[in-house]
Amino acid sequence: MMDNMQTEAQPTRTRILNAAREIFSENGFHSASMKAICKSCAISPGTLYHHFISKEALIQAIILQDQERALARFREPIEGIHFVDYMVESIVSLTHEAFGQRALVVEIMAEGMRNPQVAAMLKNKHMTITEFVAQRMRDAQQKGEISPDINTAMTSRLLLDLTYGVLADIEAEDLAREASFAQGLRAMIGGILTAS
């Protein structure tokens, strides 16, 4: 019986999260209502609150989904490609994400500036991601791809900040079509990571 309940609950939870993503990215966090989310995914308020007790709980789930997507890039050692090239490709790939998804990331970051609860969620997300990026940087140091003198913890955070800057740039997708975009990223990231 429990397996059947979990199977039924997952699609509802996913529908709620998808609706929340869309509504938050279109209307902003404060203008979005739980009622609009219910209407968008055709569920009752009771069903919504069964899965998520507040907007902050929805944001937490979205943050964790986004964190998992980021970790998928850095969880395993990077093989067959230089670390700098991997970072450039990863950042360029973000410019192809749906504009609504990119807007949602910026909206959540802005909410983190106002709301200490969301700020704590983002801090945890950033710490988790940068720990994995720092590990991949240490791997690259061992291979001699980047300078052994780099502070991997701080540099991984700066690379994350660069990534968020690209996500927030409304022209990033158009700019990324130009070869000079990847070339500039490669020069910037390579300069930081290979400087002695």
UniProtKB/Swiss-Prot annotation:
List the Gene Ontology MF annotations in alphabetical order: DNA-binding transcription factor activity; transcription cis-regulatory region binding
Sorted alphabetically, which InterPro entries does this protein's record hold?
DNA-bd_HTH_TetR-type_CS, Homeodomain-like_sf, HTH-type_TetR-like_transc_reg, HTH_TetR, Tet_transcr_reg_TetR-rel_C_sf
DNA-binding region (UniProt annotation): 33-52
- Mind listing the UniProt keywords for this protein, alphabetically? DNA-binding, Repressor, Transcription, Transcription regulation
Domain of life here?
Bacteria
What does the record list as GO biological process? DNA-templated transcription; negative regulation of DNA-templated transcription; regulation of DNA-templated transcription
What does the function comment of this entry state?
Repressor for the uidRABC (gusRABC) operon.
Q: What is this protein called?
A: HTH-type transcriptional regulator UidR
